[in-house]
Amino acid sequence: MAQSSNSTHEPLEVLKEETVNRHRAIVSVMEELEAVDWYDQRVDASTDPELTAILAHNRDEEKEHAAMTLEWLRRNDAKWAEHLRTYLFTEGPITAIEAADTAGEGSGGDAAKGATAQGDGSLGIGSLKGEAALARPPRL
């Protein structure tokens, strides 16, 4: 996989800066996920409890790195953002969400049986504006 970070399919001179940066991010995610897989295997194979704990900790750090880079991709690529909003943090069959989304039934496909997603990027908590004012004691 190291070769992926040193090579592009097209000459660098013809690529936009944002394309090169996305390439860096994508390769980083690939490397982080590969490291997660390696650490998973080492955790399974280790017979020493302390080493197992260290390896599991290291694996989880790699997951954090992958998540951070995915967030960068979401913030810097509208199509990534659209797809991540459709599929992440939903319930129900993923393929049903995809079918509902491609049928034009909205982001996350609430029409998909059991699916829940907020197409507006919200966590579904709702607004707390005005509620703080109600909870405050009157000024004297």
Swiss-Prot record:
Binds a di-iron center symmetrically between each dimer. Fe(2+), Zn(2+) and Co(2+) but not Fe(3+), Ca(2+), Mg(2+) or Mn(2+) induce protein oligomerization. Binds 1 Ca cation symmetrically between each dimer in what is called the entry site; in vivo this may be an Fe cation. Its main location: other. Residues 100-140 are annotated as: Targeting peptide. The keyword Phosphoprotein does not apply. Fe cation 2 binds at E32, E62, H65. Changing E62A: Forms decamers in the absence of Fe(2+), binds 1 Ca(2+) via E-34, loss of ferroxidase activity. GO terms for cellular component: encapsulin nanocompartment. Residues 100-140 are annotated as: Disordered. The decamer has negatively charged patches on its exterior, and a negatively charged tunnel at the center, that are probably metal-binding sites. This is Encapsulated ferritin-like protein. It comes from Rhodospirillum rubrum (strain ATCC 11170 / ATH 1.1.1 / DSM 467 / LMG 4362 / NCIMB 8255 / S1).
